[in-house]
């Protein structure tokens, strides 16, 4: 039995200058999902986002990349959730996670923002913490004062390869989540190990 996911959200900052920065890992994941399923995203002025739709069998999934900056991501999510009457527990948000190393991604249900401004704004705008999360590891600079520069910087070639490979697996795990459910998707993604290349 699959898990209902009605809204897939990728977090990032809009604009070419941010495209390859670590903070845009959520965008990368949604782009990968859309590429695999031949989904086209189009601008929507009301929700200030790029939006798309994927229908297969019983699944009817809306996809959103907010085009406000990260700390205003909640506007787009709340606007679309309200319009399509999607409850928080049927929303899946993909975003970059400092507390996981590159090459690791984890599903999570509910909880606080963990210092992530995009998640913080979604909680504030939707009034709920109950949405599912897909946390994509980007690593940590080791010093709290360096976090802003780190997330807005580009990963090294090796880190980027680890992140990209992991995103491919995480994107496929969303298919597993909808087809086979939370437990199977968790098992698949959480047992993934990146290939280390010398």
From Swiss-Prot:
Residues bound to tRNA: 18, 69, 71, 117
GO cellular component, one term: cytoplasm
SUPFAM superfamilies noted in UniProt: Peptidyl-tRNA hydrolase-like
Cell compartments where the protein resides: Cytoplasm
Enzyme Commission code: 3.1.1.29
Pfam families: Pept_tRNA_hydro
PROSITE patterns: PEPT_TRNA_HYDROL_1, PEPT_TRNA_HYDROL_2
Subunit note: Monomer.
Protein family (similarity comment): Belongs to the PTH family.
HAMAP family xrefs: Pept_tRNA_hydro_bact
Record function comment: Hydrolyzes ribosome-free peptidyl-tRNAs (with 1 or more amino acids incorporated), which drop off the ribosome during protein synthesis, or as a result of ribosome stalling.
Keywords, comma-separated and alphabetical: Cytoplasm, Hydrolase, RNA-binding, tRNA-binding
Catalytic activity, as annotated: an N-acyl-L-alpha-aminoacyl-tRNA + H2O = an N-acyl-L-amino acid + a tRNA + H(+)
Residues of the site described as Stabilizes the basic form of H active site to accept a proton: 96
Protein name: Peptidyl-tRNA hydrolase
Biological process according to GO: protein quality control for misfolded or incompletely synthesized proteins; rescue of stalled ribosome
Record GO terms (molecular function): peptidyl-tRNA hydrolase activity; tRNA binding
Site annotation Discriminates between blocked and unblocked aminoacyl-tRNA: residues: 13
Active site: 23
């Amino acid at each position: 039995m699959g898990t209902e996911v009605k809204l897939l959200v990728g977090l990032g900052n809009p604009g070419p200058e941010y495209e390859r920065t670590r903070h845009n890992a959520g965008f990368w994941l949604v782009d990968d999902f859309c590429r695999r399923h031949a989904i086209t995203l189009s601008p929507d002025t009301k929700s200030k986002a790029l939006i798309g739709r994927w229908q297969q069998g019983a699944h009817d999934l809306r996809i959103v990349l907010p085009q406000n900056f990260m700390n205003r991501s909640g506007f787009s999510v709340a606007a679309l959730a309200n319009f399509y009457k999607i409850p928080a527990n049927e929303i899946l948000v993909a975003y970059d996670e400092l507390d996981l190393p590159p090459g690791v991604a984890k599903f999570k249900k509910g909880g606080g923002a963990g210092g992530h401004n995009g998640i913080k704004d979604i909680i504030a705008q939707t009034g709920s913490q109950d949405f599912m999360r897909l946390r994509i590891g980007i690593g940590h600079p080791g010093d709290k004062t360096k976090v802003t520069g780190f997330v807005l910087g580009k990963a090294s070639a090796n880190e980027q390869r680890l992140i990209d490979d992991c995103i491919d697996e995480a994107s496929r795990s969303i298919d597993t989540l909808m087809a086979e459910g939370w437990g199977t998707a968790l098992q698949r993604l959480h047992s993934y190990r990146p290939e280390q290349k010398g």
